[in-house]
C-alpha cells in the first residue's frame, strides 16, 4: 500500500486488512476498526486519494468471509450537527457547516454499509471513555455467533452473486447475515 500523507486512506487500509485476513484459514474472521470513516477521497484536500473506491471496497466485502465491526468516533459530526440545530447560527455559517458535514455523513453511511454487508454491527461512541464497554460488547457478540453451512442445489461456479435468506422462529432473537454469496 502506498503511503498517504496528511490524510486517511480508509478504503486502502480496509483493503489491506482483507488481504491479510484472506491468508487466515479455518478461523472466524472479524475486523474491529475504530474510525471516523472519512477517506481522503471524500475531501477536497489536495492529498493523494485511496487506490480503491468505496464501491470497490463494498463489492470486495461482500465476497470475503470477514465480519466488520466499525466503532464510529467522529466528534466533528456531533459538533457540526449540534451547531446546525442552534437557532442563532446564520444562514452563511449553516452553508459552511453543511459543506464540512457532508463527508462525515457520507462516511457514516459507508461504514454502516460495510457492517451490514459483512453481517457486522456499527457502534457509535461519543468519546474514548466509552471504548472499553464497546470492545466488551464486540467480544461478547463474537462469542455468540453461530455458523450455518449451506449447500446450493445450483452447482454452477460462475462468479455470480446468489441471494440467500435466513429466518428464525424464536421471538426476540436477532439474525444478522450476509445477503448472499458469490459462487466460486
Locations of regions flagged by a protein language model:
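Scaffold/interface architecture of coatomer-like assemblies
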Residues: 1-184
Amino acid at each position: 500500500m502506498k503511503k498517504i500523507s496528511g490524510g486517511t486512506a480508509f478504503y486502502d487500509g480496509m483493503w489491506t486488512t482483507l488481504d491479510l485476513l484472506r491468508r487466515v484459514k479455518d478461523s472466524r474472521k472479524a475486523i474491529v476498526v475504530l474510525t471516523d470513516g472519512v477517506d481522503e477521497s471524500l475531501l477536497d484536500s489536495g492529498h493523494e486519494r485511496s487506490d480503491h473506491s468505496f464501491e470497490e471496497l463494498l463489492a470486495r466485502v461482500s465476497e470475503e468471509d470477514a465480519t466488520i465491526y466499525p466503532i464510529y468516533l467522529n466528534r466533528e459530526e456531533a459538533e457540526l450537527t449540534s451547531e446546525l440545530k442552534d437557532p442563532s447560527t446564520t444562514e452563511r455559517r449553516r452553508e459552511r457547516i453543511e459543506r464540512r458535514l457532508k463527508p462525515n455523513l457520507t462516511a457514516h453511511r459507508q461504514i454502516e454499509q460495510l457492517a451490514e454487508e459483512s453481517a457486522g454491527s456499527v457502534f457509535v461512541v461519543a468519546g474514548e471513555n466509552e471504548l472499553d464497554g464497546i470492545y466488551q460488547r464486540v467480544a461478547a457478540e463474537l462469542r455468540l455467533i453461530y455458523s450455518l453451512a449451506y449447500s446450493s442445489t445450483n452447482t454452477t461456479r460462475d462468479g455470480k452473486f446468489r441471494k440467500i435468506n435466513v429466518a428464525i422462529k424464536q421471538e426476540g432473537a436477532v439474525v444478522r447475515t450476509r445477503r448472499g454469496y458469490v459462487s466460486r
